[in-house]
């Protein structure tokens, strides 16, 4: 309230003072005729200041603080006190008065009343001046003093506008011309301009004020009306004169600027060139640094890709660093989880058994015990027991197998099998041999195993391969050996859970260091003439372990036994556990027979994985008098050659009497396409002259051939009882087989002889063996793991008296225990026959032909390991044209039907050679006169078609080919 009262009082006082000043000024103008001097003006200013002091004192009354607070409100008083007519265009007062006025306007004061009084005094002085100056119309007075009502200097504004903006210049010139015409027209006192924009109206207002006219807007507010007044004048200078001056000035300035620009351009060019060079240098440095960083970042990926493209590529620097002595966990996993690890080639996968996986298979080693890393040739420490780990994280090193560890399954939650109290203790110290860089021509490494002297710590050694999650090209190896007696681990028989803990049988005596040499041969450099292989001749029966039974699932997730009359126990060897997202390789429970076991597991994604344990009885070891190696072509066990990424595997066994430090070897053969490999076999003292055996059927994309040469350990036992050599293997497929239904499994053959007693055809004839050939005993045959079909029976099985799978290893009986999956040895059932070498193949088989059993046809439950299947069980009397209509399902599977004219005129006759002519013509003759062969694009497609058609109500069946067919001839015939 006090502020408002003070404001009202101040306004009233100001109004009264203004009235008095106006009256005084009017009186003075009436009676004073002379121009006031400077002294009078100064006196008036002093009087005005005194009045202001008195007014301020009367208005304050001790309310300085209140008025200080109300200064923001009192600022409105200025606009009220200032009158628009106060600044008349003809005010040519003294300079001192104008300076005083400008001072009061420019300098803000806390006392608004002082400003108002100054304005009033200014008005009074101007009125006096106007009285003295004679009034003239259209005066030529100087326009430098013209200001707008808002205090803007019109002359300066107009000159600047004329110089700066060409558009406004044209507008101002136009307005000037119209206003001059209006001034010269005495008939009209006002002029109305058309409607225009607000900016142009502002220009018109200022030009009219500059000419001393009244300027207002009409009712619409968009048109300006100007009126002539007594103060109307014509400026001394026209607008065009300012423009001419500006043009001249601009021309001179331009000329000067041109010279300056030229000199500056030279400097700029010099500095620009230097700057350009500097920019180039900096860009090069930045590019080189960024390239160096990118090389450092992506060096690992490029090296991984180089290892993928060539199996002969050496290990990376990080892998070489693992050769330094340090714990195993630091060797195989560096703690950092990588989203992608480069795949391992077959040559570098032996490096410390440290397997790198791709995709989700992230290698991690959690071995808690202290270990040692040794160069090639150093021995392994105490054995260990390891189990396979999860599907997404695979083991690159060793894992301690405690009593609480169980197998983790992905997607298919298979019930885990609890370990027995006889489960092995944690890891002991061990050494893993790392291989140096395997050069392109040759590289080798040694995997050594040394028995432990601690009898109180019985354990088995298993270097676990990782789960293969995505890539089918990955290959891994397992070197397994035992050196101590192991108590029998009794597993309760279960029909639903697969074995999750794997234990290899121990030894009853201390084992000398065993070495396996791994050799790599690039394409075309395999020394065929230097590698000599001999067959095994002495078989021995290998009975299954009594108290050791492995669970066999009857449901989809497990392995299904195919022989009801066989004991569901002692499935010795390997169990391939196939999961939808990864491929795990599990070693099953081996029987604790107290024999020396040394195994090598070679894992191929599209091919079977084989475990080749070589064991000698702990109480009976025969010292051989001479060296008699054995070559087992694993590729021959695969019917019809190899899949796209398959690798033929050859096993060679050398007795310890002839072995030296590097005698055992595992070699890789890089096949150039489907070339044949001559594997000469050196004649032994107990065998007839060698006969060359040819192995082919390797697909062009096959990465290589593996030749493994194993040493048979020595032992202190007498030679009465022969040692036991067991060959067991497992077949499992890659991820591409996930689509197969779990129920599409083979049923066992009706022939008990084919189920219980089957032997495979070896490389050479068992007649070369100097020892007797007892009946080979097979423990059981498995069907496979769902959702992937695993094959049940084997191609070209033999009868109980033919002895094809019985060989002698230095006088030691040998029996091939085909415990779980397809057999390891059947050389004659492979599609290796070339057109010009059929006689040689049949010459080799002719020696075994007399010993063959009549039960050589397994019927519709044949194991499908190749691409070629024979079509059987067609309806009687059906013609070739009608039969072609039945093969639509085969055509949908990608199969190509070939009609081969049988030599004897009988369908499916085995006596004909493999060079039958493929006839693609359509004839009305009977289909029984032909051997109908279906060539599938892959063994997987053949397997799926066989499972689908043999288990359905189709009018024909598919079986494995009873003789060897040249795939190239069949494909060439189908393409014609």
UniProtKB/Swiss-Prot annotation:
SUPFAM superfamilies the UniProt entry points to: R3H domain
Low complexity biased stretches: 306-317, 401-415, 543-560, 692-714, 759-777
Region feature (Disordered): 32-71, 105-147, 257-376, 401-457, 480-560, 661-725, 738-780
Lineage top rank: taxon: Eukaryota
Pfam families in the record: R3H
CDD domains: R3H_encore_like (cd02642)
Record-given protein name: R3H domain-containing protein 2
The organism of origin for this protein: Homo sapiens (Human)
Gene this chain is encoded by: R3HDM2
